[in-house]
């Protein structure tokens, strides 16, 4: 193996090692688990994913606002869970972008149950914790036909 090829291989291996030590699970898997916890109304599981200084931006709907403390975030999810009961989450277009500093996962999610809640989701992870979450109510998602 030539020196440049060896250097590239070592660099790729180092990046993979840095990724595996920074995240207990892949960010897309963490996002899916978070979304499923939201659908199930499992407030403790939802809030366990957040980092110490996390922010939840809820854009639209009755819980519209910025939640910048863990108590405020937990209160918002508790209200949501009580108002909606268990839901089914249809997740589409999940994408992950990552670099050594963190990862962002985006997805279109339609929660269905007592009511239908269409959401454009953006979740940012650093050091394996959810640090920024945007919950954008997106009415056009509810109007889309189901994909099979």
Task: Pin down the residues of each PLM region.
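Surface-exposed, charged secondary-structure patches
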Residues: 71-115
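Short beta-strand edge/turn micro-motifs at domain boundaries
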Residues: 116-148
């Amino acid at each position: 193996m030539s020196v440049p090829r060896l250097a590239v291989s070592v660099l790729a291996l180092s990046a993979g090692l840095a990724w595996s030590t920074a995240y207990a699970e892949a960010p897309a898997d963490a996002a899916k688990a978070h979304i499923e916890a939201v659908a199930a109304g499992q407030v403790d599981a939802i809030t366990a994913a957040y980092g110490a200084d996390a922010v939840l931006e809820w854009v639209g709907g009755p819980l519209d606002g910025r939640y910048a403390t863990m108590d405020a975030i937990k209160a918002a999810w508790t209200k949501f869970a009580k108002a909606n009961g268990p839901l089914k989450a249809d997740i589409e277009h999940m994408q992950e972008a990552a670099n050594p500093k963190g990862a962002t996962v985006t997805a279109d999610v339609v929660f269905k149950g007592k009511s239908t809640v269409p959401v454009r989701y953006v979740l940012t992870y650093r050091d394996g914790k959810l640090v920024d979450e945007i919950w954008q109510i997106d009415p056009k998602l509810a109007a889309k036909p189901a994909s099979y």
